[in-house]
Swiss-Prot record:
<dbReference type="InterPro" id="IPR036388">
    <property type="entry name" value="WH-like_DNA-bd_sf"/>
</dbReference>
<dbReference type="InterPro" id="IPR000600">
    <property type="entry name" value="ROK"/>
</dbReference>
<dbReference type="GO" id="GO:0003677">
    <property type="term" value="F:DNA binding"/>
</dbReference>
<comment type="similarity">
    <text>Belongs to the ROK (NagC/XylR) family.</text>
</comment>
<protein>
    <recommendedName>
        <fullName>Uncharacterized protein YphH</fullName>
    </recommendedName>
</protein>
<dbReference type="Pfam" id="PF00480">
    <property type="entry name" value="ROK"/>
</dbReference>
<dbReference type="InterPro" id="IPR036390">
    <property type="entry name" value="WH_DNA-bd_sf"/>
</dbReference>
<dbReference type="GO" id="GO:0006351">
    <property type="term" value="P:DNA-templated transcription"/>
</dbReference>
<dbReference type="InterPro" id="IPR043129">
    <property type="entry name" value="ATPase_NBD"/>
</dbReference>
Length: 397
């Protein structure tokens, strides 16, 4: 049985809406907030006054406005903690610092690392944090970590990390908080992409999916504007949908998963086997083959890679067709290094998808299924993981 909403709950909801708008807009006046929130300016004034008393927002004078203090600009209180957003693998760390408003500070960085053990990986994260703390000594800087594989966002444990040489869980959150004395939040790298789209793409649908086609293939769903993780935090494992029951064995132990056909790691394995069968004069070293070399070979029209890329796109399209039948999410964004295969690769995916059986000719075209490349920069993508703190704050109001 559902209960009615009392005045306190309505006030809580409205405060969250205004804070969400300020995190998205970064700066806004009352009239803009009233228009976006679809309430009156006096109602917005009352909410802002309460949020200001709680030191969550501040008002600054805007010289371009001429109607007094009430027309000033409002923003999230800048005195709050900053966040160091990291996307972490055993071979690289991408980082972007953000202030209390989740606006980027400093430059986006990509660092190559060598982490053969969990301890080595944690050490690299610590070094990265210490370096940024020295750059911004006047601010408390918390950590937001995006890690590939299965992650428990509540305990902050990396349960499986496919690219890593180890197979044991790593208590990332606990160990870093104990060592650094700061807050640490951890989630999956596909959740990072979903949060980035949710908070930084103002034209985003309430329901959408991001798919990361890279070393592996992962995805994250946003349903009714909320990240769907599942009770065991294993949702979005589209890379382990089976496309060929008699196919190659996958790292998960099953046969013919999408990752064994369509991921970059699968394409590189096929390329290494093929290159080893070629004359010594072949320019590419199969043991040192890089993703950049693989993509360059495709761009130059090498037939051996062209057919594999087409096959991978067909497999992704087939998986998406099944996915559309089940969830009826009509906006899908593709991210990852495989997007460098370009429009032909994307069009093959779309053709294999065919059509969403739930699309109807009489429906509005804006609601038709859309599959495309994500448009956020890499810095914006990594910044997405920082919104874990924003969503945690909104839950606690």
């Amino acid at each position: 049985m559902r209960a009615c909403i009392n005045n306190q709950q309505i006030r809580h909801h409205n405060k969250c809406v205004i804070l969400e708008l300020l995190y998205r807009q970064k700066r806004a006046n009352k009239s803009t907030l009233a228009r976006l929130a679809q309430i009156s300016i006096p109602a917005v004034s009352n909410i802002l006054q309460e949020l200001e008393s709680e030191k969550r927002v501040v008002n600054i004078d805007d010289e371009s406005q001429t109607r007094g203090h009430s027309s000033g600009t409002w923003l999230i209180a800048p005195e709050g903690d900053w966040t160091l957003c990291l996307n972490v693998t055993p071979t690289s760390i991408e980082c972007q610092v953000a202030n209390a408003c989740l606006s980027p500070k400093g430059e986006f960085e990509y660092l190559q690392i060598d982490a053969p053990t969990p301890q080595a990986l944690l050490s690299e994260i610590e070094k990265c944090w210490h370096r940024h703390r020295k750059l911004w000594p006047d601010h408390t800087i918390n950590l937001a970590l995006a890690i590939h594989g299965q992650v428990d966002p509540v305990t902050g444990v990396s349960q499986t990390m496919p690219q890593a040489p180890w197979t044991t869980p790593v208590e990332v959150k606990y160990l870093l908080e104990e060592k650094l004395g700061i807050r640490v939040m951890v989630d999956n790298d596909c959740v990072m992409l979903a949060l980035a789209e949710k908070w930084q793409n103002n034209s985003q649908e309430r329901d959408f999916c991001v798919i990361n086609v890279d070393y592996g293939i992962g995805s994250s769903f946003v349903i009714n504007e909320q990240i769907y993780r599942g009770s065991l935090y294993g949702s979005g494992q589209i890379g382990h949908t089976i496309v060929n029951p008699d196919g190659v064995v996958c790292d998960c132990g099953r046969y013919g998963c999408l990752e064994t056909v369509a991921s970059l790691s699968a394409l590189k394995k096929q390329a290494r086997v093929w290159l080893k069968s070629q004359p010594v004069s072949t320019q590419l070293d199969p043991e040192k083959l890089t993703t950049a070399q693989l993509i360059a070979a495709w761009q130059s029209g090498e037939p051996w890679i062209t057919s594999w890329v087409d096959r991978s796109a067909n497999a992704i399209g087939l998986s998406l067709y099944n996915f559309l039948n089940i969830l009826n999410i009509n906006q899908i964004w593709l991210y990852g290094r495989s997007c460098a295969f370009g429009e032909n690769w994307l069009n093959t995916i779309i053709r294999q998808t065919g059509f969403n059986p739930f699309d109807r000719d009489e429906g509005p075209s804006v609601k038709a299924t859309q599959i495309g490349f994500g448009q956020l920069s890499r810095a914006q993508q990594v910044l997405g993981i920082g919104y874990l703190y924003v969503e945690a704050q909104l839950r606690q109001i």
